[in-house]
Amino acid sequence: TINNELEEWINQSKPISNLPVIQEWDTFTIPYTSGTTGKPKGVLVPYRSRILQLFGMAVEYGCYSPDDRFLAIAPMCHGAGMIFALAPIFFGGYAEIMDQFDPEEIVTALKKEHITGFFGVPTHFHGILSLENAILEKNKPASLETIISNAAALPQAIKEEIVKVFGDNVLHETYGSTEGGIISNLRPADQLRKLQCVGQPFPCTYIKVINESGDECNPNEVGEIFSSSPYLFNGYWKRPKETEEALDQGWLTVGDLAKRDDEGYLYIVDRKKDMVISGGINI
């Protein structure tokens, strides 16, 4: 029990001195890209972009508040895995970090811990949905409000199964990059209406698709995707040439090819340079 001893212990403590002074453009973290154009590059992510990204996530996903409980199943070495685990804590909520990926343990925790949201990559969802129907039915989560998929395209068959098992009002499919943060999101209402689509611009994000002539593409014309938002990185660590190639007057490209339909929804088509994605991690 908590009694007067706690107050006495606090009163005897000394204030912490010499705390570091953090400026908004200081580097928060340096994750590394997959290195599809050569050696992996360190991405200088400032505090400003990540904090603003957290507020954007709260607006878009609606699952971050002091009352929310998030299950972190992705590794912390993954940029999205880390930010989706930090978000609930930032807003005063709860995050339970799984020490390994075990589909049955995850669905058990979803129900037992009254989890309201979790983030995963397609490999996670494939594992969860491979469980026996009896296990899924037994552990049907009553509190779950938000599921977020990211890091690789979510196959339509898996998407339909997620909707069938967890409901038609919880799934978001998000597109983004280490350098640009979250760029677009396909909301629950559009999951079965827009096939192989990554949605519309994330809050405070502008998107344009540019053809080889340097002009904006017409609807359904494939081009290179550029994004501009408060969530961009500061550049590549000690790689000024690559930074200059990626950033152009506040617009970022990471070499993804895409198209937009007549309603402005975004579809990722290919990459300028090929890569292998395993478990949501670019190789």
Regions found by a protein language model. Name each.
Residues 14-25, 30-71, 83, 93, ...:
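Conserved adenylate-forming
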Residues 151, 176, 199, 256, ...:
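Active-site glycine-centered loops adjacent to acidic/histidine catalytic or metal-binding residues
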